[in-house]
Design a protein with these regions (language model features):
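Phosphate/nucleotide-binding beta-alpha loop and adjacent structural elements of enzyme active sites
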Residues: 1-245
Length: 245
């Protein structure tokens, strides 16, 4: 039984079976299951709000998701990505779309550019890294309605911080998460990014995936949709709602 979770396939994501249902599933940023699209829950409800906040983390200068959100809602969209030099990002013109050459992580760090060091490679984290609490405090965003993550291998670090302190500041966790989760496949000659991340929570074994799911559950998140990537046996797209606030 245990051996079945050692294979390089989607079975390792068994902890992320759906725990609830969503009455309205929408594909944002492209066709369903396309590489650049995400599966969201209740976008029409978000569209009825006069104002809302959406964070898009790790866009890699691809704006399909943001433009679709802007078209379907009245939300203010903030995109965060510190990989490579800032000038490589070309933000579409829209008063509700904002780009920040910042990454999100568990701790705050300056980054090579702030330290006066050269940084030109697109995969290198050139800008500053801020925590979610830093970001929300800086922009006075007490509530994030939707958080989209494309940060291969760094998913855990976003939630590895002191949320009790954040709550004391009146800051709330995002109400909905859209993220692709990756686990590391060791032993490759050129390991993918998720095997080269530098933190203590690399997802590699089925036990690691269980711990990550448990960590999300403790923060109130349940899976309402899972979409395994057919082109990537160690990747799955998750839609999670926060049901415990």
């Amino acid at each position: 039984m245990i051996n079945q979770y050692k294979a390089h396939d989607h079975q390792k994501f068994f902890p992320f079976e759906s725990m609830g249902t969503c009455n309205e599933i929408s594909c944002i940023g492209g066709k369903c299951s396309a590489d650049k699209s995400k599966i969201a829950c209740g976008i029409s409800n978000l569209g009825r709000l006069d104002s809302c906040i959406v964070y898009s983390v790790g866009g890699n200068n691809q704006w399909e998701f943001e433009l679709d959100i802007l078209e379907k809602t009245n939300c203010e969209v903030h995109t965060f990505d510190c990989s490579g030099p800032a000038q490589r990002f070309v933000k579409p013109e829209n008063d509700r779309l904002h780009f920040h050459h910042i990454c999100l992580g568990a701790t705050r760090s300056a980054g090579p550019l702030a330290e006066g060091k050269p940084c030109t490679r697109e995969k290198e984290l050139c800008g500053e890294t801020w925590t979610m609490t830093d970001i929300q405090s800086h922009f006075s965003h007490k509530q994030i309605d939707l958080l989209k993550l494309d940060i291969e291998g760094w998913e855990w670090t976003i939630f590895d911080q002191d949320y009790a302190a954040a709550a004391a500041l009146g800051l709330n966790l995002p109400m909905q998460l859209l993220m692709e989760v990756h686990y590391c496949v060791p032993g490759r000659r050129n390991p993918r990014l998720e095997c080269r991340v530098q933190h203590n929570y690399t997802l590699e074994t089925a036990s690691d995936v269980v711990r990550f799911q448990s960590h999300l559950l403790k923060n109130g998140y349940v899976v309402v949709n899972r979409d395994d990537n057919p082109s990537c046996p160690h990747c799955t797209e998750l839609t999670l709602l926060r049901v415990s606030c």
